[in-house]
């Protein structure tokens, strides 16, 4: 899997969860203490989030890191 493919899957999972819980980019930015520009880049797939960003986003969205990154599915 390429980095680009990883980002695309990350975006898909984050945006689905955001819709499910009724969060927009601005709210996610505020709750994660990340700039709106950074969240926007993550959600456009133009920037790969750091591990700490993935952890932070997973906590805010109440998702496990495995659920958010699908690594759990890869090792089943």
Functional labels for PLM-detected ranges:
Residues 1-24:
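A short, Lys/Arg-rich alpha-helix, primarily the initiator
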Residues 16, 41, 70:
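DNA-binding alpha-helical recognition surfaces that contact promoter or target DNA
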Residues 18, 29, 58:
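The alpha-helix within a helix-turn-helix
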Residues 19, 33, 44-46, 73:
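Residue-level detection of the helix-turn-helix DNA-binding "recognition helix"
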Residues 22-41:
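Short alpha-helical DNA-recognition segment
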Residues 23, 49-52:
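Residue-level signal for the short linker/turn that defines the boundary of a DNA-recognition helix
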Residues 52-67:
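DNA major-groove recognition helix of helix-turn-helix/homeodomain DNA-binding modules
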Residues 67-76:
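Short amphipathic recognition helices of helix-turn-helix/homeodomain-type DNA-binding modules
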């Amino acid at each position: 899997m390429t980095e680009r493919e990883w980002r695309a899957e990350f975006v898909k999972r984050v945006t689905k969860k955001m819709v499910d819980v009724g969060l927009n980019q601005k709210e996610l930015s505020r709750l994660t203490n990340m700039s709106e520009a950074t969240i926007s880049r993550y959600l456009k797939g133009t920037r790969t989030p750091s591990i700490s960003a993935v952890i932070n986003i997973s906590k805010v969205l109440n998702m496990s890191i495995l659920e958010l990154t699908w690594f759990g599915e890869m090792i089943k």
